[in-house]
Structure formats: C-alpha cells, structure tokens
C-alpha cells in the first residue's frame, strides 16, 4: 500500500475522535497520531504535512506541532515501519470480514 492510502486509513480512524482537535487535547493527540504514522512507516515530512493540514486550522502553533511530531518519531524510532504490513486495501478488508461470517 502507498503512504497516501495508509494516511487515508489512519485519517478515518483519527477523525472518529473529534475531541482530539479541541484545545487541551491537541498536543497529546498530535504525539499519538505521529506515533501511528511512524509505526506505519510514513516519512516524517509526510506526517508533518498531514498533521499540519488537520491541526493548523484549529489554531495550533506550527512550531509546537513540528516539535511534537519530531519528539514522537524520535521516541518511537525503533518502531518505524513495524506495523506497515498491518494495513490492507478496503476491498481486501471487506472480503476477509465477509469470509469470517
């Protein structure tokens, strides 16, 4: 799967929790979302671009966002890409769900 496909999957998951985007929750949310992107093997610059697109419109500071993403990637460096194989296209996921019923 491409980085963009994985980011889209993660975006759908992240968007389920709208409280992540309100003041008071954003710093922790950025760190956790960056961790997920890191574990999926997404390049840090792509992760920053994605997270900026989600958090800067909420008024979050760009430098603080970059700091949190860098901190998360640094802290989780040994996990970079370790969960990339867990992602599969929706059509494949849907097929496996119907076979299990």
What does each model-identified segment do?
Residues 1-100:
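Modules that initiate DNA replication and primer synthesis
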């Amino acid at each position: 799967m491409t980085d963009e496909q994985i980011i889209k999957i993660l975006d759908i998951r992240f968007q389920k929790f709208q409280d992540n985007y309100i003041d008071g929750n954003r710093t922790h949310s950025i760190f956790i979302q960056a961790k997920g992107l890191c574990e999926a093997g997404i390049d840090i610059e792509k992760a920053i671009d994605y997270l900026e697109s989600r958090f800067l419109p909420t008024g979050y500071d760009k430098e603080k966002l970059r700091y949190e993403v860098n901190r998360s990637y640094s802290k989780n460096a040994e996990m970079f890409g370790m969960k990339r194989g867990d992602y599969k296209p929706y059509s494949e996921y849907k097929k496996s769900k119907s076979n299990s019923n």
